[in-house]
Regions:
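Class I SAM-dependent methyltransferase SAM/SAH-binding core
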Residues: 129-162, 348, 354-357
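A conserved beta-strand element that flanks and buttresses the S-adenosyl-L-methionine
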Residues: 178
Length: 419
């Protein structure tokens, strides 16, 4: 077990010596984004900043899984969390779409539903309102309290095969088990997948949503690399581990979350595979999704992009323009630290989550403020750090009367748009 230099919160971490999925000992380095604090470790202005941990991804030479080379103690990352699903209108609206799709597959029957990593219960609230019996599991004690206060029963714990057995004993097997943007966060993925199988009724359905590696690769989403995301999952890599536990994919949908995600549907029996599932597999194959060459090109392009992004921001500073950021997301932390941008460049970062206000961003040390307070600084330029919510955030800026330059870091090449 390694630790970093002393600070108020020293982050314990381990460097892996083998693949987390297949245990092969050859995991090749792909991209090194330097030493960075864990992305959601916001801190008070008068406190010492959080410690830094290497942020590197590699590729298993055997099973091709793309994964972080360091594992930060999950208790330090997830026991107290600052991301609330309900603060993003895109996610709230998508919850209704997600429920529609689920009910189409379950043919409208009332189901018992377990969600792993249920956050504030936004998705389960929609399903409960539609007549389903719901239960959430989430390790963040503070967010579990929010969920329970809103009427969503939630167990505050890390999901595992042992917890799954307890849930089944105290409740029942579930018709549907959902894991949305959870599987990339889990070091012992075998225990979680085994637990999902353990929780699932014989004719049940497991639904896995994850930021899709083909889009990460094609659109250069290197900012989705941070210490909470231990994997960059493809459909291929998800199927690889799910199949080991008898879970078989039969359909796939797309989701707007994280700038583009897959929603894959699995069952314990062989079901007819949808055309969209076959098309997704073919697309990943055409990209050589697991190849070392593809990810080495990704790393080269990411390195070039970081420099271009920094130059745009520094160029605006040289013209005496006042700059704020919008969206103190986890991915913004990777982006800012990789580009070595800080409070000397960006006056403040606006965020719609009140829990983050008055806190400092890790590494870049920029104050997070309310949207109104950020606009009161009279910015000439807004850096759209949470670019994956572009439509929502641009609409908010326009409605507030902002007129000026907006730097769009991703996807693709960083560029400026005028509004």
């Amino acid at each position: 077990m390694s630790t970093n230099t002393p600070s108020v919160e020293v982050h314990e971490f381990e460097t892996i010596d083998r693949c987390r999925i297949c245990q092969n000992q050859k995991v090749d380095l792909i991209l090194d984004l330097g030493d960075q604090p864990p992305a959601n470790c916001l801190y008070k202005q008068n406190d010492n900043p959080p410690s830094r941990v290497p942020l590197r991804i590699g590729r298993c030479a055997s099973c091709s899984t793309i994964q972080l080379l360091e594992t930060v103690n999950p208790e330090q990352l997830f026991s107290k969390y600052v991301w609330l699903t309900q603060t993003a209108k895109t996610a709230v609206n998508y919850a209704e779409v997600f429920a529609d799709r689920l009910e189409k597959i379950t043919t409208g029957k009332s189901c018992s539903i377990l969600e792993v990593g249920s956050n504030d219960g936004t998705f389960l609230k929609v399903l409960h309102r539609r007549g389903h019996k719901v239960l959430g599991v989430d390790p963040a004690v503070n967010i579990g309290k929010v969920a329970r206060e809103s009427g969503v029963p939630t167990v505050s714990d890390f999901f595992s095969v042992n917890l799954a057995r307890d849930l089944v004993k105290n409740h029942q097997k579930f018709d549907v088990v959902i894991a949305r943007n959870v599987l990339p966060h889990v070091s012992d993925l075998h225990s979680v997948i085994a637990g999902i199988k353990e929780s699932l009724a014989v004719d049940g359905i497991a639904i896995f949503e994850f930021h899709r590696a083909d889009m990460i690769l094609e659109e250069l989403h290197y900012d989705s690399i941070y210490h909470e995301h231990l994997y960059l999952h493809s459909l291929k890599s998800i199927e690889n581990i799910a199949n080991r536990y008898g879970l078989l994919a039969f359909d796939v949908d797309e989701s707007p979350i994280s700038g583009g995600s897959f929603v894959a549907y699995f069952s314990l029996s062989v079901l007819a595979e949808s055309p969209s599932l076959k098309a997704a597999r073919e697309h990943e194959s055409s990209l050589q999704i697991g190849s070392l060459d593809a990810w080495q090109r990704f790393a080269e392009n990411a390195t070039d992009h970081i420099l271009k992004f920094r130059n745009i921001v520094v160029g605006a500073i040289s013209e005496n323009k006042r700059i704020i950021g919008f969206g103190a997301s986890a991915r913004s932390s990777t982006l800012l630290n990789a580009a070595q941008l800080c409070g000397d460049h960006i006056l403040a970062i606006a965020d719609n989550n009140a829990w983050k206000h008055s806190l400092m961003t890790p590494g870049s040390a920029i104050k997070i403020v309310s949207f109104d307070e950020a606009l009161s600084l009279r910015p000439d330029v807004v850096v759209l750090l949470a670019w994956n919510f572009k439509s929502e955030l641009l609409a908010q800026l326009k409605n507030a009367g902002f007129s000026g330059e907006v730097i769009i870091p991703l996807p693709g090449s960083p560029h400026i748009e005028l509004i």
